[in-house]
Amino acid sequence: SAEAPALAGVHLFCAAILYARLIGPDEVSESLRKKIVAELGNQKAAQPDYAGFMGILALYYLGDFVSINRIIPRYRHDTQPADQPCPVIAARLVLQSFSNKASHEASKNVMAFYRENDGFAALHHAPAADLLSTAVALFALHFIDADIRIIKPACLSFVDKLYQHGGFVATHDDTQPDIEYT
């Protein structure tokens, strides 16, 4: 019997997503699925909504909709703390969509991080956009079928400008490509 590698947290979730997309269902994907369900059951993450988003997204790609339906009630929040970063607010939007609670107001909360003719910033008061926030925000907005036609050209241009020397940098001020962004 195949066993999933000894991974946890975001590493487990990302490995499961990649494995599901590249390999598909088999004994390893089943082992990954079981580990994710167990990990989401004892979630003690600093950002539980973001960890839940990543875990549920992994289950989505693994095709485990039964576990998603069982787990999603833990993430049904009607309030959104104002001090949360863009990736967490965007993650919450995706989680809400699984329980049919995504709203126009929730997508406006994500759009509040958009910087005109650029991308999305991590925090409301951050002066510049960054690649991670832009990617997560665009993913969340696309996931709920929000109309992103107006911001799409600027965001694509922003991402394109972050590709330097064979890899991606996090922001315009970054000079060194990072494997995390590539």
Model regions: which residues?
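An alpha-helical repeat/solenoid feature that recognizes helix-turn-helix modules
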Residues: E3-V28, A45-I68, Q80-E105, A122-I150, ...
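Alpha-helical repeat scaffolds
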Residues: V28-L40, S67-H77, S103-M111, K152
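HEAT/HEAT-like alpha-solenoid repeats
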Residues: A38-A45, P73-P81, M111-R115, G119, ...
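Short, charged N-terminal helix-start/capping segments
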Residues: D64-P73, N117, H165, H172
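Glycan-recognition and catalytic cores of secretory/periplasmic carbohydrate-active enzymes
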Residues: A102-E116, P153-H165, V169
